A protein has these predicted regions:
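Bacterial N-terminal signal peptides
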Residues: 2-10
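Intrinsically disordered, low-complexity N-terminal segments that are enriched in acidic
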Residues: 15-88
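Generic recognition of flexible, low-complexity loop/linker segments
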Residues: 65-67, 116, 154, 187-190, ...
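Secondary-structure boundary elements
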Residues: 93-156, 164, 232-234, 243-257
Length: 257
C-alpha cells in the first residue's frame, strides 16, 4: 500500500486570474496512454482502465458509467465512460445527511454557516464557492480534521475542501458524500496531461446527484474525473478507500474515444 498525499490542481486563487502554482508535495501521478490531450476538448470520454486487484470494482458515479468489466486471472480491465449522465437515483440518500466524526454538522459554527445557504437559489453552488474562497491557505500535509476545525483554520487541500463542503451541505439538509479518485490536469509537477489523486463531493439536489468540487467551482468538467471509491468519513482510512488507493499502484488508463 502506498500512502498518498491528497493533492489538488488549481488550489491557488484562480478566481483572481492567477496561475496555479506547483505545490511542493509528493503526489501519485498516472500518465494516461493514447491521445490524452483530447480529453480537454471533449464532454464525454471513454477510457480503458487496467489494474491487478481482481476484487476492486469502480463505482457508478455522477459522472461515470462502467460499460464493461472483465476480471481475468491476474488483472481486471474496465471500459469506463465519463461525462454528463442522468444519475437520478436517490436510494439510501438519507444516510448522507448523518453526522460523522469528520462531518461534525452538530457544531454551532457549521450549522450557522450552512443556514446562510438554505434559502438561496443554488445552495450547492453557493457552498462550493464559499469553501473555495474561505480556505485561503491552500496547502497539503494536514492531518484529516473535522469540518468545524477546517472552518476555523481556513487551510487545506482537496481533502479539507471536500470535508467542509460535505458538512455544510448536510447541515443545510442536502445529502452529500465525498468521492476519492483522480482528476486529469493539464500540468502538474512539470508533467502534462496526467491524472492525479483528488477528492470531491457529490450532492443530491433537485432530484439528482450532482458533482461539486470546491477546489475549482468554476472549472468542473465531468469527463476529467474518475471516481474510485466513496469515503465514509467515519474513519480516516475506511476499507473501500484503502482498496481504491491500493489499486492505484499498478493502474494504467488509456483514452480510447
Amino acid at each position: 500500500l502506498i500512502l498518498l498525499t491528497a493533492i489538488c490542481i488549481g488550489l491557488t486563487p484562480c478566481c483572481k486570474g492567477e496561475h496555479a502554482s506547483v505545490l511542493p508535495v509528493t503526489a501519485f501521478i498516472i500518465e494516461p496512454e493514447g491521445d490524452a490531450a483530447a480529453v480537454f476538448s471533449e464532454k464525454i470520454t471513454t477510457f480503458r482502465i487496467s489494474y491487478q486487484d481482481r476484487e476492486f470494482v469502480l463505482p457508478r458515479a455522477v459522472n461515470q458509467v462502467v460499460l464493461e468489466h472483465k476480471a481475468g486471472e491476474l488483472s481486471s480491465t474496465v471500459i469506463l465512460r465519463t461525462g454528463p449522465s442522468a444519475y437520478l437515483t436517490g436510494t439510501g440518500r438519507g444516510r448522507y445527511l448523518d453526522a460523522t466524526p469528520y462531518l461534525d454538522i452538530h457544531k454551532m459554527a457549521v450549522k450557522e454557516k450552512a443556514a446562510l445557504f438554505i434559502k438561496s437559489g443554488d445552495p450547492v453552488g453557493g457552498i462550493s464557492h464559499f469553501v473555495h474562497g474561505h480556505i485561503t491557505d491552500k496547502k497539503t500535509g494536514i492531518p484529516m480534521l473535522p469540518a468545524s476545525v477546517i472552518l476555523q483554520n481556513r487551510a487545506g487541500d482537496c481533502t479539507e475542501h471536500s470535508i467542509l463542503t460535505a458538512a455544510l451541505l448536510r447541515a443545510a439538509g442536502i445529502p452529500a458524500r465525498c468521492v476519492t479518485g483522480v482528476i486529469m490536469a493539464r500540468e502538474f509537477s512539470g508533467r502534462r496531461n496526467v491524472f492525479v489523486y483528488h477528492m470531491w463531493v457529490e450532492a443530491y439536489y433537485g432530484g439528482r446527484w450532482i458533482l461539486a468540487d470546491s477546489t475549482r467551482p468554476e472549472d468542473v468538467h465531468l469527463n476529467r474525473y474518475i471516481a474510485f471509491a466513496y469515503h465514509s468519513l467515519e474513519t480516516e482510512t475506511p476499507l473501500d478507500y484503502i482498496a481504491a488507493i491500493s489499486s492505484l499502484t499498478d493502474m494504467t488508463i488509456r483514452r480510447i474515444r
